[in-house]
């Protein structure tokens, strides 16, 4: 469509990131149409039609300097972003424009960021396991290839570090394409991630889309859809894609920021009334079809460590595996701080993971649960008052707890200890030996921050 044919309107009101634009009554823009400010690259997205030719829009960029009377043009189509191989190795913003100063993106194919979720008969569920090399995840909450995983945790318990380690272990081993959407997170983390990918020579297989903390709410609200659109394109070409989102909570928060300005009545805890619908629209598109798969890992910030908060609670229902990071475990110095009693996976089924893996997982959880029940008694009366069986359970549980810790590759520069990738077979063998009592003679500190069980035996020799 030539620029001459674009219908023009005028800005009539600006309130923060929400802009009202008046158009001729016979040519009002549709919902989700992209409008462009005349003489600049600023894009507005239509959210509501208020009547009398006025539409209410969200500004995808800084609204500084906007005033009433400025001319806006209707592109008559939703926001479209470049997709395909030219996006790999590049950093883009919410509109698919490059922000890495490496020249334009030479892509002939663009795709609207608003797509329908695949039809029911196109879906292709999978039970194939995806090995991560992280003991606690592979044992307690294994991931399915083409599944959805959430990393839940409060501030500072290690969501981003866990996400980086998963990217390091899966994306490098995976060999396929990955898409990373940085939604409302720190710019520093985006920069670190870019250099991490560059140094490990996998940047040419990753598309990066950033809408960071310092950007207006419109950008943060839509950047997850931009990243997802790129991942969907690779999936529809028959590829297996990894899709990483950090952080889903900021996507919700951006919606909350603009919801009140759009004139909606807030619902529980001040969230937007459309929270479940917005989350559903995003999550239902992150799925595997008969053409290809999207395996997604999403970090989810938990406000005030409250998992019943509407935002994380709405996210739970969409996931195949939930990895819950606990402040209590982090305070013991055990990293990754995954709570083995709170984390779950739909793959924990003897028909999927096998009888041995299933029984070891359940025995590990039973031992830890027993220790949790006895902790109050130990705190009041001490260990001496416990029965011999309970003393043994506590000793094994403390060893399991320490053996669930593991040095990460991405944390090597901070900790000084080299990262460990532990194959699933080794993980199962190690925990089987602990619950079977084959390690009862070893000191518990031998299990802290090691990879396989053999390393624990070696460490015990050094300690003794």
UniProtKB/Swiss-Prot annotation:
Enzyme Commission identifier(s): 7.1.2.2
Subcellular location: Cell inner membrane
PROSITE patterns: ATPASE_ALPHA_BETA
Pfam families registered for this protein in UniProt: ATP-synt_ab, ATP-synt_ab_N, ATP-synt_VA_C
Positions of disulphide bridges: none
Positions that bind ATP: 153-160
InterPro entries in the record: AAA+_ATPase, ATP-synt_VA_C, ATP_synth_F1_bsu, ATPase_a/bsu_AS, ATPase_alpha/beta_chains, ATPase_F1/V1/A1_a/bsu_N, ATPase_F1/V1/A1_a/bsu_N_sf, ATPase_F1/V1/A1_a/bsu_nucl-bd
UniProt keywords, alphabetically: ATP synthesis, ATP-binding, Cell inner membrane, Cell membrane, CF(1), Hydrogen ion transport, Ion transport, Membrane, Nucleotide-binding, Translocase, Transport
SMART domains: AAA (SM00382)
Enzymatic reactions: ATP + H2O + 4 H(+)(in) = ADP + phosphate + 5 H(+)(out)
Protein's membrane topology: Peripheral membrane protein
NCBIfam families cross-referenced by the UniProt entry: atpD
Primary role: Produces ATP from ADP in the presence of a proton gradient across the membrane. The catalytic sites are hosted primarily by the beta subunits.
Family (UniProt): Belongs to the ATPase alpha/beta chains family.
Protein name, UniProt field: ATP synthase subunit beta
Organism from which the protein derives: Burkholderia cenocepacia (strain HI2424)
Organism classification: Bacteria, Pseudomonadati, Pseudomonadota, Betaproteobacteria, Burkholderiales
């Amino acid at each position: 469509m030539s620029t001459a044919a674009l219908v023009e309107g005028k800005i009539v009101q600006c309130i923060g990131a929400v802009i009202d634009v008046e158009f001729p009554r016979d040519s009002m823009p549709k919902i989700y149409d992209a409008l462009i400010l005349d003489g600049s690259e600023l894009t507005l997205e239509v959210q509501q039609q208020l009547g009398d030719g006025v539409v209410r829009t969200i500004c995808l960029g800084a609204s500084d300097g906007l005033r009433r009377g400025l001319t806006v043009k209707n592109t008559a189509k939703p926001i479209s972003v470049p997709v395909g191989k030219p996006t790999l190795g590049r950093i883009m913003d919410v509109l698919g424009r490059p922000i890495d100063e490496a020249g334009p993106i030479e892509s002939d194919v663009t795709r609207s960021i608003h797509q329908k979720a695949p039809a029911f008969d196109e879906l292709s569920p999978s039970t194939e396991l995806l090995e991560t090399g992280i003991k606690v995840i592979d044992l307690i909450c294994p991931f399915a290839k083409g599944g959805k995983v959430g990393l839940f945790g409060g501030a500072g318990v290690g969501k981003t570090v866990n996400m980086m380690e998963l990217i390091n272990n899966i994306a490098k081993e995976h060999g396929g394409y990955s898409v990373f959407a940085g939604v409302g997170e720190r710019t520093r983390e985006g920069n670190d991630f870019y250099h991490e990918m560059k140094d490990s020579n996998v940047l040419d297989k990753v598309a990066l889309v950033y809408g960071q903390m310092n950007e207006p709410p419109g950008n943060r609200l839509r950047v997850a859809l931009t990243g997802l659109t790129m991942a969907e394109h690779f999936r529809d070409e028959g590829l297996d894609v990894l899709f990483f989102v950090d952080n889903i909570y900021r996507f919700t928060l951006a919606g909350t920021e603009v919801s009140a300005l759009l004139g909606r009545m807030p619902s529980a805890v001040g969230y937007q009334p459309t929270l479940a619908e917005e989350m559903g629209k995003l999550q239902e598109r992150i799925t595997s079809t008969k053409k290809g798969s999207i395996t997604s890992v999403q970090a989810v910030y938990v406000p005030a460590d409250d998992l019943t908060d509407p935002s994380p609670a709405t996210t739970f229902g969409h996931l195949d595996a939930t990895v819950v990071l606990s402040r209590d475990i982090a305070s013991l110095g055990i990293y990754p701080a995954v709570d083995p009693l709170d984390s779950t996976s739909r793959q924990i089924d003897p028909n999927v993971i096998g009888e041995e893996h299933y029984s070891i997982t359940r025995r590990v959880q039973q031992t830890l649960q027993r220790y949790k029940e006895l902790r109050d008694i130990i705190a009041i009366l001490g260990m001496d008052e416990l029965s011999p069986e309970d003393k043994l359970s506590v000793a094994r549980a403390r060893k399991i707890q320490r053996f669930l810790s593991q040095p990460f590759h991405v944390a090597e520069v901070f900790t000084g200890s080299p990262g460990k990738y532990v194959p699933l077979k080794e993980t199962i063998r190690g925990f089987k030996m602990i619950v079977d009592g084959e390690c009862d003679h070893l000191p518990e500190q031998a299990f802290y921050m090691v990879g396989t069980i053999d390393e624990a035996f070696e460490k015990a020799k050094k300690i003794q």
